[in-house]
Swiss-Prot record:
Main location: cytoplasm
Site-annotated residues for Important for catalytic activity for the proton relay mechanism but does not participate directly in the coordination of zinc atom: D148
Xref: SMART domains: PKS_ER
Disulfide bridges in this chain: none
Name of protein: L-threonine 3-dehydrogenase
Gene giving rise to this polypeptide: tdh
UniProt family annotation: Belongs to the zinc-containing alcohol dehydrogenase family.
Alphabetical keyword list: Cytoplasm, Metal-binding, NAD, Oxidoreductase, Zinc
EC number: 1.1.1.103
Organism: Shewanella pealeana (strain ATCC 700345 / ANG-SQ1)
Cofactor note: Binds 2 Zn(2+) ions per subunit.
Necessary cofactors: Zn(2+)
Function: Catalyzes the NAD(+)-dependent oxidation of L-threonine to 2-amino-3-ketobutyrate.
Record field: catalytic activity: L-threonine + NAD(+) = (2S)-2-amino-3-oxobutanoate + NADH + H(+)
Amino acid sequence: MKALSKLKPEEGIWMVDAPKPEVGHNDLLIKIRKTAICGTDVHIYNWDEWSQNTIPVPMVVGHEYVGEVVGMGQEVRGFTIGDRVSGEGHITCGHCRNCRGGRTHLCRNTSGVGVNREGAFAEYLVIPAFNAFKIPDDISDDLASIFDPFGNAVHTALSFDLVGEDVLITGAGPIGIMAAAVCRHVGARHVVITDVNEYRLELAEKMGATRAVNVAKENLEDVMQELGMTEGFDVGLEMSGVPSAFHSMLDTMNHGGKIAMLGIPGGDMAIDWSKVIFKGLIIKGIYGREMFETWYKMASLIQSGLDISPIITHHYSIDEFQQGFDAMRSGQSGKVILNWD
């Protein structure tokens, strides 16, 4: 079968002919229709320090996808051949305290599809049936293929009450932009998103952000004054992993504010903890998606009228995968879809 693999410990991704994966007793065999390129895949392509310390070589990569069930193990229940599915990319152990307590997204033994085990950039993928999510008929393949990053946005955004609140999002990558759309959809008052990438800031405004702020050109506190804000942001969503962005968030949060952090800093990050203490801030780390509450919320948000389709800006056939990666690496894109049909 065709597959995209990290063949060598150097920059790049390569098309290979890989063996079709074998199906275990509790597994689904999924024929892939569409995949999306994640920022993680770009890290793997670039072969940065994180990738060098994490990714086994060679390995098929990718973890954002939609496909059709074409085979299943003898113990599988609840699925039928032909079901359209996406899937949770975090494979959990099922026996640690958090798994047994129903907090599977906090499994200490998590294995990532396309990160620690064979991924979805292939004609076929095998995952445990537990990890599969049936896609409702009224949700398109394009949207279903980005449920993984959309889930990161939903999990982060819905960590705290947003109704009538003022929200600051630092980092206008695709996940930050989708989070802005979620915040507006569920009733936030002002949603301000910051970055230095003009293309993505414009995309954020199309997706519903009240103000998209290029912090290289504008002062965030001036924008707050322009919006009539007098006490600071109630909720912060840190999506960038950039220390200066987080410092700006701490400066502009209201007392008693709440921060959800999804962005991963490149190294140790020093902050002024006195601001956290004296402002009484709550900081919550976010990893992945809640299984499977986030998935049901994703489907419900779309079915209730949330439109995230503008975040998908490029489509390529799988044979044009290099152009897809080039688009993602340029920063002049939203989500990039690779078609396998």
